[in-house]
C-alpha cells in the first residue's frame, strides 16, 4: 500500500468528523457535494475547461469529471455518484478502483438527468454545496450553500491533514521541475512563449492542468503583477525574468515565484539577492500564535529598508513606511493560504462561525489576516516593482521630492522582483516545501577540495551556499566567506562578509547540479 493510501484513511476520517459536527450543530440529515457541470461556450458547441468544485475535491482526487455527487452524513460510508456515460465522442473515465474508492459506496451515473434516483428522496434537511443552484432547486433542495455550513468548512480547510500535506509536497516537486526548465530556457535566450512551453513539458501539465495561469515575464513585463501574455518573440536583450508558476497534484496546488537577472552582475542582481534574504527571513517568522498581518507589516519595513539602502528613496526606512511610500513599490499582500485552491479559503476568518479577522490599519486588501496555527500552509511572496502607473501617482504627491528618479529610471527596464515559497507550519518547526524538496543530484563534496574543483547544488543566479564549518585549504578569511555560483557563466565568486565579491575561479566548473533555491 502506498503512502497516500495510508494517509488517506486519516484524511477521510477527519472529513467525516467535521461533517458529523456541522450537521449535528445545524440539525441536518447530511451534506451533498456537487462536482459541477461542463459549461458550453456562448453560441458554440464547445465547452470551457472543467473546473471542479473545491469542496467536492476535498473528499477525493476526482478533478476532471463533471456531474458527480457525494452524499455524506459523517457516520455512514459516504455515497459517491460517479458519472460514467456511454459516449463514443469522448474519453470515458474508468470505474473508480484506486485507493480512495474503498471509502465510498459507489453508484454509476450514465445520464446527468437521472441523478435524482440516486440522491436522497427527502432533501429538506440536506445542504447542497455547489455552484449550480438552479439544478439544486429543480432536484428539490431547499438549503443551498447555507452560510453556517460554508463558514464551518472554509474555516477548517485551513488545517491540512497529513494526506493533504503529502499531496502539496508532490505539487511542489512538480513545480520545481518546471521552474528549473524555465530558468534554463531564460538563460538560453528564449522567448516568454518558449519558456512557458519548457515549463509545461517539464511538469507534464497542460495549461488546464496547472493550478493557475502561469506568469512568465521578461524585462519590463516583470512589473505587471498578473502578466499572462506570452510574447512569441524573444527581446533583443534579456535583462530580467520573473516566473510565477505552480502545479497541481490530486487537486492540491503549488505556487512558486522566482526572479532572475541575466548577467548576475550590477545593481538589479544585488537587489534580487537582497530581496531573497528578506524573503527567507519572512518565511522563518511564521509561527503559531502570530497574526499573518504582522508579517505583512514587517515586509513593508523590509521593503522600506531596501529602498533606503539602494538609494531609491532618500529617507530612512521608518520615514518611508510612515509616508506610505512602500505601497508604490510593494502594492500587494505578503501571501495567502494555499491548498485545494491557490488562494485558499478561510484566510480572513477568526472562528468557524465566520467572524472576520480585521487586517492591519492601512492594508485593507490582504488575502490573509488569520492567526497562524499548526498544520496550516502559507505562501510568502514579498515583491519590489517599478510600475509606471503607481510611480506616476507617487510623482504627483509631495513624496516626489524624496524619490531618486534617476535610480528609478535605471531599474525600470528590469520591471520588478517577486520571490515566493510554500511553507507548512508545524507545532515546533517550519517546512519550506519549495526549498527543502528541491531535486538533489550527486555533487562533489566541498570538504577538503580547492575552490575551482567543486560544484554546488544551487541553480539560482548569484544564489548562495554557505559551505561546512570544516576548513577548506584556504586562509581563514576564505573559510568564513560565502561561495556564489553564476550558472550561465559557470564562474565562482566568493563573497566576503565585509568586502565586495572577488573572482576566485574563471575556468569552467564541473557540471552544476540543478535544484531550486
Swiss-Prot record:
Its cofactor is Mn(2+). Can be used for the catalytic detoxification of some nerve agents neurotoxins. The keyword Magnesium does not apply. It holds the Pfam family Peptidase_M24. Optimum pH is 8.5 with DFP as substrate. Optimum temperature is 50 degrees Celsius. One of its GO terms (biological process) is proteolysis. Belongs to the peptidase M24B family. Bacterial-type prolidase subfamily. This is Xaa-Pro dipeptidase. Has a stereoselective preference for isomers with R-configuration at the phosphorous center of sarin and soman, and with S-configuration in phosphotriesters. InterPro entries: Creatin/AminoP/Spt16_N, Creatinase/aminopeptidase-like, PepQ_N, Pept_M24, Peptidase_M24B_aminopep-P_CS, X-Pro_dipept-like, X_Pro_dipept.
Amino acid at each position: 500500500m502506498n503512502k497516500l493510501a495510508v494517509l488517506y484513511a486519516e484524511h477521510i476520517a477527519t472529513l467525516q468528523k467535521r461533517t458529523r459536527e456541522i450537521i449535528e450543530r445545524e440539525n441536518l440529515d447530511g451534506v451533498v457535494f456537487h462536482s459541477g457541470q461542463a459549461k458550453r461556450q456562448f453560441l458554440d458547441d464547445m465547452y470551457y475547461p472543467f473546473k471542479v468544485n473545491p469542496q467536492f475535491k476535498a473528499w477525493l482526487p476526482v478533478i476532471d469529471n463533471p456531474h458527480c455527487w457525494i452524499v455524506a452524513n459523517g457516520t455512514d460510508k459516504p455515497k459517491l455518484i460517479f458519472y460514467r456515460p456511454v459516449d463514443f465522442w469522448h474519453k470515458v473515465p474508468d470505474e473508480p478502483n484506486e485507493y480512495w474508492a474503498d471509502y465510498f459506496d459507489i453508484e454509476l451515473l450514465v445520464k446527468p438527468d437521472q441523478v435524482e434516483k440516486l440522491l436522497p428522496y427527502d432533501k429538506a434537511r440536506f445542504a447542497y454545496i455547489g455552484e449550480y443552484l438552479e439544478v439544486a432547486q429543480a432536484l428539490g433542495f431547499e438549503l443551498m450553500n447555507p452560510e453556517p455550513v460554508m463558514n464551518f468548512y472554509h474555516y477548517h480547510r485551513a488545517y491540512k491533514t497529513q494526506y493533504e500535506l503529502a499531496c502539496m509536497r508532490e505539487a511542489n516537486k512538480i513545480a520545481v521541475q518546471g521552474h528549473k526548465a524555465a530558468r534554463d530556457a531564460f538563460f538560453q535566450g528564449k522567448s516568454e512563449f518558449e519558456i512557458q512551453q519548457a515549463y509545461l513539458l517539464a511538469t507534464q501539465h497542460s495549461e488546464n492542468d496547472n493550478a493557475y495561469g502561469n506568469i512568465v515575464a521578461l524585462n519590463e513585463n516583470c512589473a505587471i503583477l498578473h502578466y499572462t501574455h506570452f510574447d512569441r518573440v524573444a527581446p533583443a536583450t534579456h535583462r530580467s525574468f520573473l516566473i510565477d508558476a505552480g502545479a497541481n497534484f490530486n487537486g492540491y496546488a503549488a505556487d512558486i515565484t522566482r526572479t532572475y537577472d541575466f548577467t548576475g552582475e550590477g545593481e538589479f542582481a544585488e537587489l534580487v539577492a537582497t530581496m531573497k534574504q528578506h524573503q527567507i527571513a519572512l518565511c522563518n517568522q511564521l509561527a503559531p500564535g502570530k497574526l499573518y498581518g504582522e508579517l505583512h507589516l514587517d515586509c513593508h519595513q523590509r521593503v522600506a529598508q531596501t529602498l533606503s539602502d539602494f538609494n531609491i528613496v532618500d529617507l530612512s526606512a521608518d520615514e518611508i513606511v510612515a509616508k506610505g511610500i512602500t505601497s508604490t513599490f510593494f502594492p500587494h499582500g505578503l501571501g495567502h493560504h494555499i491548498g485545494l485552491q491557490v488562494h485558499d479559503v478561510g484566510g480572513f476568518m477568526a472562528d468557524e462561525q465566520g467572524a472576520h479577522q480585521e487586517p492591519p490599519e492601512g492594508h485593507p486588501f490582504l488575502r490573509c489576516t488569520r492567526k497562524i496555527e499548526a498544520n496550516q500552509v502559507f505562501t510568502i511572496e514579498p515583491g519590489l516593482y517599478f510600475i509606471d502607473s503607481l510611480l506616476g501617482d507617487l510623482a504627483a504627491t509631495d513624496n516626489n521630492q524624496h524619490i531618486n528618479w534617476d535610480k528609478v529610471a535605471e531599474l525600470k527596464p528590469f520591471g520588478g522582483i517577486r520571490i515566493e515559497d510554500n511553507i507548512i507550519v508545524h507545532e515546533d518547526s517550519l517546512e519550506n516545501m519549495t526549498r527543502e524538496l528541491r531535486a538533489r543530484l550527486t555533487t562533489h563534496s566541498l570538504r577538503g577540495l580547492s575552490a575551482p574543483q567543486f560544484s554546488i547544488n544551487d541553480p539560482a543566479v548569484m544564489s548562495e551556499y554557505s559551505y561546512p564549518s570544516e576548513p577548506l585549504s584556504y586562509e581563514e578569511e576564505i573559510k568564513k566567506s560565502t561561495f556564489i555560483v553564476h550558472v550561465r557563466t559557470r564562474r565562482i565568486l566568493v563573497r566576503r562578509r565585509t568586502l565586495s565579491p572577488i573572482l576566485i575561479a574563471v575556468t569552467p566548473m564541473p557540471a552544476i547540479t540543478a535544484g531550486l533555491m
